[in-house]
Amino acid sequence: VDQRLEGHEDDGVTTILCLGDDPFSLDQGEGGLAEQIAAKTGATVYNGAFTGTTMAAQYESYNDGYILDAFSFSYVADALASGDFDLMKQAATYSYDEAFPRTTAMLEGLDMNAIDIVCIMYDGSDYINKRPCDDPNAPESIITYTGALREGINAMQAAYPHIRFVVMSHTFCHTINEEGNFENGDRVDLGNGTLSHYLQKELDAASDCGASFIDNFYGSINEDNYLDYMTDYIHLNDAGRELLARRFTDISFLFIFLYLN
């Protein structure tokens, strides 16, 4: 038996918590990504994603002028690990998105002991918003893409050792230049590397944390097929969400099912 499961009582139900941004938070209906994962796996799935957020925070310490940081990955993960949602609840009252207070309340009410899997997916928003990819001198810096991932997973893992983590990478996307034209996210470096650089660093960070990793960049939606799966420069259509849900199910769920049983 895995030591991380020691002392943990299995309730017989596989329960998944999805964290991230638009791939999970937009279009939460039958065609939604979390809903399709639930349909394909038979698991109970909770959707704790926030639209328009990023993995990395913008500021090193919280700034009331930028409430989205309170819903970036490390802040959400720390709230789940500590049970202290005060900052998220306060910030949610200033959000124009009515889903923010609702999702925050759902997360606060979750029994994390019942969660078996945390699935994390952010699209290319960190790249587009020029969030630093990593800081070799501060591997858990929350203002970097990989630092926030490490800090957040480590915080939740320390609080709930039984939880298994799955990191789903971003897909292909474009950035939009000053003239309003699309530019290939894997050819244009906005200052912190191209999309494939972010992918490799995310893989390294996931490996550091013992998380499973699913490559959606080379493995799912790329520059050759994105027109079939995306509505614009970054957002997925129903077919795109179905493809990612199928990839999650095919790759990780079988391994995790064996791990949990």
Regions picked out by a protein language model, each given a short descriptive name:
Residues D11-V13:
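Acidic, glycine-anchored loop motifs typical of Ca2+
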Residues L17, P23-D135:
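Conserved SGNH/GDSL esterase-like catalytic core that processes O-acyl groups on lipids
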Residues D22-L26, P132-I143, V188-N192, Y229-H235, ...:
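Second-shell loop/turn segments in exported
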Residues Q28, A38, G42, D123, ...:
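Sec-exported extracytoplasmic/periplasmic mature domains
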Residues T44, I163-V166, S212:
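Proline-centered loop/turn at the N-terminus of a beta-strand
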Residues D64, H170-N261:
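Catalytic His-Asp segment of secreted/periplasmic serine-dependent ester chemistry enzymes
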Residues C119-R131, I153-L195:
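Active-site segments of SGNH/GDSL-like serine hydrolases
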Residues L149-N154, L199:
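Generic structural signal for well-ordered alpha-helices
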